[in-house]
Amino acid sequence: MKNKLPPFIEIYRALIATPSISATEEALDQSNADLITLLADWFKDLGFNVEVQPVPGTRNKFNMLASCGQGAGGLLLAGHTDTVPFDDGRWTRDPFTLTEHDGKLYGLGTADMKGFFAFILDALRDVDVTKLKKPLYILATADEETSMAGARYFAETTALRPDCAIIGEPTSLQPVRAHKGHISNAIRIQGQSGHSSDPARGVNAIELMHDAIGHILQLRDNLKERYHYEAFTVPYPTLNLGHIHGGDASNRICACCELHMDIRPLPGMTLNELNGLLNDALAPVNERWPGRLTVDELHPPIPGYECPPNHQLVEVVEKLLGAKTEVVNYCTEAPFIQTLCPTLVLGPGSINQAHQPDEYLETRFIKPTRELITQVIHHFCWH
């Protein structure tokens, strides 16, 4: 029953107090099971049907889908349950204790983005879900901060096709309709070690990598010349060489060299297209030195994302907020949810506070966020 639902600030406090860190390092990684249980119980109290799904390939992580209403279409409100690890010693407050001070709510996940679920629950307190004319779905995902495994799995397996979706990442309540993607690769070259006094008896992996880097930088120039999206502050795909390591001694021919790089593609560029461009760029090295160069993913790739600017969702949200949609350079789960329905990224708090010590959400976002959630539910589920 709704009268069992705690006050807004107590919901927020309980979410922050329930650790759900995701990390590639196993020692830091945590299950989100306790947080999912909290959310599931609250949405059941509001009259929602709740389904909890294990996410394959994760360390005991779960998605939750809460649904009410019948028929096709409707609205999906989505967010992730996990946070990044916190920097021990750099926080001046307990990351897992919600603390209010000087118009700010402090705690790990206040902005990015456990708080969004507190806003949804509080807004639904005054909504009679039995009278919805179209379905309302609430999706809570796992591992957004690492592999985005939760959103990927949901998009791959669900039969739902809502009319539209909103992901409540911290955008300072400025609607976002597009962002770049992210691809990160390891380029590895296997040479042949030997004594440096006789270079002909070995194959120097550093020299081969030098050749490969030249072709990769040509690809970077080609991407900049060929692809443009003027709405972005950096209106072309970027390519960065971020890490390199090779060899072990000055008097030894280098046997192995490894380069880490990333590409941030524009919306509309497919992952297959980018992989093809990279492989084509490195083809001369492979032809000259067959079998010595490999390209491997460092992290699962994220495509670029764009919601059609003329979609009803964009028009409605722009009218409600009195603000035009924007494009951003960071990544979200939107590319995966967008495969199901037109999607906007829109939520309280600033991205500038995400992943920072003493993360906070300004209390000035409380009233307009609650009003916005209520308005979009009324528009897309009652009309």
UniProtKB/Swiss-Prot annotation:
The protein's enzyme class: hydrolase
EC number: 3.5.1.16
Pathway: Amino-acid biosynthesis; L-arginine biosynthesis; L-ornithine from N(2)-acetyl-L-ornithine (linear): step 1/1
Reactions listed under catalytic activity: N(2)-acetyl-L-ornithine + H2O = L-ornithine + acetate
GO molecular-function terms, A-Z: acetylornithine deacetylase activity; zinc ion binding
Database matches in SUPFAM superfamilies: Bacterial exopeptidase dimerisation domain (SSF55031), Zn-dependent exopeptidases (SSF53187)
Positions of the catalytic residues: D82, E144
Subunit structure: Homodimer.
Sequence similarity: Belongs to the peptidase M20A family. ArgE subfamily.
HAMAP family (UniProt xref): ArgE
Name of the featured protein: Acetylornithine deacetylase
Species this chain originates from: Escherichia coli O139:H28 (strain E24377A / ETEC)
